[in-house]
Amino acid sequence: QAYVAGSHPGVIVGMNVSFAGLLDASEAAQITALFSSSDDVFVSYYLGDNGFGQVSSTTVPADLDTMIAFAGSRPLILKELGYATGTTGHTEAGQVAFITDLFQAWDAHASRIPMVTISRMFDGDPTECASEAQSYGAAGNQDFIAFLCTLGVRTYADAPKPAWATLASAAARRGF
């Protein structure tokens, strides 16, 4: 951080951690040390089961509180987030609830979270999702492929999923 600040004043230094990684007690000391010299904290966040069979989160407000606590006085950037509708136990209604809860929780912490990036606008092409899963070392993992392919708020064919209207309305109410 000192080098960057000296060489390129005004450049923000940060790194990304997944929310699941943030919760990993065995890595807590290393993650805290890595972030000790960052200006901002970047987190990737996917509610519930990420396709690998592990549930890393349960409720958006509680999870956001955990992220804010970790960030301390630094801004929290939600670098990528989403809710896949195709993984085991996930639904389109769940994606609507996720978007609703996200905006409500963001409103509660608006001064601390300057940016939120929803991971994917559109669901993926199944062939491309299978290839992407392979790059993660998860070739043939159908739940993970479904996770990658159903993160969008619009289908691959560009039809709106129920969460699209929720997202558009919530964004419009906030001037986006």
Task: Describe these PLM feature segments.
Residues 1-27, 73-86, 113-123:
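Aromatic-lined carbohydrate-recognition surfaces of secreted/lumenal glycan-active proteins
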Residues 1, 30-34, 59-67, 94-105, ...:
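A general structural detector for well-ordered alpha-helical segments in enzyme core domains, enriched
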Residues 2-11, 37, 66-76, 105-113, ...:
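A structural motif corresponding to the C-terminal end of an alpha-helix
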Residues 18, 26, 46-49, 60-63, ...:
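Long hydrophobic alpha-helices with heptad-repeat/coiled-coil character
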Residues 8-19, 44-59, 112-123, 159, ...:
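Hydrophobic transmembrane alpha-helix bundles
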Residues 3, 45-46, 83, 136, ...:
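Sequence-level detector for tyrosine residue identity
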Residues 24-88, 107-108, 112:
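Glycoside hydrolase catalytic-domain groove-lining segments
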